[in-house]
């Protein structure tokens, strides 16, 4: 069970949803009701669902399953990267490339290219190329690191995906669904929770 309490969530303001005119009716089971034009999230339910999601993720990791954290919103990028690295897992923090899951073998080509450039830079073998080509490979590495750097050591599809904003990452949710990969996501009152296996209603 997580150490986060309902009081912690309340103090963080996670109970404030979106304006009532911007809600998704599918989120009704997770809402107390409106207050001053804003929907209030049922944090008692959020806490139970949060604990359930944590237990599910923990169980997968104990069974050597990997976790992919996805958060490309500017506000989430640094946190996603930091927390994924802290627990030895993987992340996408800038852009979700179409086919990142459903066409993973092709994505691995980009990962292999990134690792190849890194290896040449580290052992100095890149210096056998003309200066112009070295500069181009340097720029290519920056782009590849931005796009696939967070998954360059992910050898197979993840056991579970954790998503900060399922509205923004709808393609990731869709790809996971096609492959039967469970999705854990933060779901605000304006979210469509369909396709999300472990919903965590709260303000995003």
Curated annotation (Swiss-Prot):
Recorded GO CC terms: cytosolic small ribosomal subunit
GO biological process terms on file: translation
One Pfam match: Ribosomal_S2
Keywords: Ribonucleoprotein, Ribosomal protein
PROSITE patterns cross-referenced by the UniProt entry: RIBOSOMAL_S2_1, RIBOSOMAL_S2_2
Highest taxon of the lineage: Bacteria
InterPro entries: Ribosomal_uS2, Ribosomal_uS2_bac/mit/plastid, Ribosomal_uS2_CS, Ribosomal_uS2_flav_dom_sf
Keyword Ribosomal protein tagged: yes
Molecular function in Gene Ontology: structural constituent of ribosome
Family: Belongs to the universal ribosomal protein uS2 family.
NCBIfam families on file: rpsB_bact
HAMAP family according to UniProt: Ribosomal_uS2_B (MF_00291_B)
PANTHER family attached to this UniProt entry: 30S RIBOSOMAL PROTEIN S2 PROKARYOTIC AND ORGANELLAR (PTHR12534), SMALL RIBOSOMAL SUBUNIT PROTEIN US2M (PTHR12534:SF0)
Descriptive protein name: Small ribosomal subunit protein uS2
């Amino acid at each position: 069970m997580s150490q986060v309490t309902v009081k912690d969530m309340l103090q963080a303001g996670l109970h404030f949803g979106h304006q009532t005119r911007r809600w998704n009716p599918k989120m009704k089971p997770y809402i107390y009701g409106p207050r001053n034009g804003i929907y209030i999230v049922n944090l008692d339910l959020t806490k139970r669902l949060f604990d359930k999601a944590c237990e599910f993720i923990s169980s997968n990791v104990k069974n050597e399953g990997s976790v992919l954290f996805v958060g490309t919103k500017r506000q989430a990028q640094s946190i996603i990267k930091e927390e994924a690295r802290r627990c030895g897992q993987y992340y996408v923090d800038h852009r979700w490339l179409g086919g990142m899951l459903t066409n993973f073998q092709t994505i691995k080509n980009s990962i292999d290219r990134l690792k190849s450039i890194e290896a040449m830079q580290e052992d100095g073998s890149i210096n056998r190329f003309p200066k112009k080509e070295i500069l181009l490979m340097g720029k290519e590495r920056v782009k590849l690191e931005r796009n696939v750097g967070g998954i360059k050591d992910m050898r197979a599809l993840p056991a579970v995906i954790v998503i900060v904003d399922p509205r923004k990452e709808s393609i990731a949710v869709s790809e996971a669904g096609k492959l039967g990969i469970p999705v854990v996501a933060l779901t605000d009152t304006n979210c469509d929770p369909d396709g999300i296996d472990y919903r965590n209603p709260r303000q995003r």
